[in-house]
């Protein structure tokens, strides 16, 4: 069976299964333009799709050589609609993944481009006192740190006390068509590595005591063979660079709505 982190694909796979002749209960889906929203309403839907209860919004991206700004602006609006954050709610942005492995470096490279303000608000209140408090961390992976990412993020969250946590991670898709072309946003948290059979401790409200939102893009696809194999595009380095710019741009516009897109170039590499 193909593995996928995308709730939309999980729903499609369930509906296409020859064994499924009944209606999919506990799940609601609707489309609007380039957005598709899948709501897993209860335990029946969660069991059928193998995903936690919550909302999953997928946004289709244009070709990676298109305008980053437009994609970032669209993403910022989706984030606001999904989270409903108040103007002064503080946020901890977490870049999950292994920076040394290109298909898994989306999270760390995105955090590198996020405008972090917590230290600026404290150090330069006259200039940045009106900004939202945003902090960020890229906790690495268990194999290189010896510590679960969740444990490191929990320690950071206990110290900075954010209103919510926004996790960014590379995902796995079941279809080549969605590889590096679909952004999934969710209010149900995330279990890193689940799409490639290396599931780590889940980031959720239960484990971190604050709402956890997840945003990710599939950068690998299941090989679909008897051997454990995953595939990634030949130009994945360029794709990750583009995707991290889109995600960071959207996150920056969402967290700092009083800034224009070009304003962020003063502080971070956009």
Question: Where are the regions that the model predicts?
Answer:
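Glycine-rich phosphate/diphosphate-binding loop of Rossmann-like nucleotide-binding domains
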Residues: 98-132, 136
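Gly/Ser/Thr-rich loops at beta-strand to alpha-helix junctions
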Residues: 96-104, 143, 170-174
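Conserved active-site and cofactor/substrate-binding residues in soluble primary-metabolism enzymes
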Residues: 54, 70, 74, 105, ...
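Short glycine-rich or small-residue beta-strand-to-loop segments that form or flank ligand, phosphate
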Residues: 58-62, 90-101, 136-140
């Amino acid at each position: 069976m193909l593995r996928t982190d995308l709730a939309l694909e999980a729903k499609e796979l369930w509906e296409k299964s020859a064994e499924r002749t009944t209606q999919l209960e506990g799940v609601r889906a609707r489309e609007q333009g380039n957005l598709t929203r899948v709501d897993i309403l209860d335990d029946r839907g969660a069991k059928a799709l193998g995903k936690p209860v919550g909302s999953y919004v997928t946004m289709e991206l244009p070709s990676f050589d298109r305008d980053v700004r437009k994609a970032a602006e669209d993403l910022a609006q989706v984030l606001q609609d999904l989270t409903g954050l108040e103007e002064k709610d503080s946020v901890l942005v977490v870049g999950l993944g292994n920076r040394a492995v290109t298909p898994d470096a989306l999270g760390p490279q995105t955090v590198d481009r996020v405008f972090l303000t917590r230290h600026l608000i404290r150090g330069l209140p006259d200039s940045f006192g009106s900004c939202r408090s945003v902090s960020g961390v890229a906790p690495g992976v268990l194999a290189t740190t010896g510590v679960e990412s969740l444990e490191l993020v929990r320690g950071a969250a206990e110290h900075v006390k954010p209103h919510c946590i926004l996790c960014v991670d590379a995902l796995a898709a079941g279809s080549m068509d969605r590889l590096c072309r679909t952004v999934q946003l969710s209010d149900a948290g995330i279990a890193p590595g689940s799409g490639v059979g290396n599931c780590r401790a889940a980031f959720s409200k239960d484990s971190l005591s604050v709402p956890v939102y997840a945003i990710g893009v599939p950068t690998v696809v299941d090989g679909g063979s008897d051997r454990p194999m995953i595939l990634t595009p030949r130009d994945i380095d360029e794709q990750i660079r583009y995707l991290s710019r889109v995600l960071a741009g959207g996150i920056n516009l969402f967290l700092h709505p009083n800034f224009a897109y070009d304003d962020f170039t003063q502080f971070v590499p956009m």
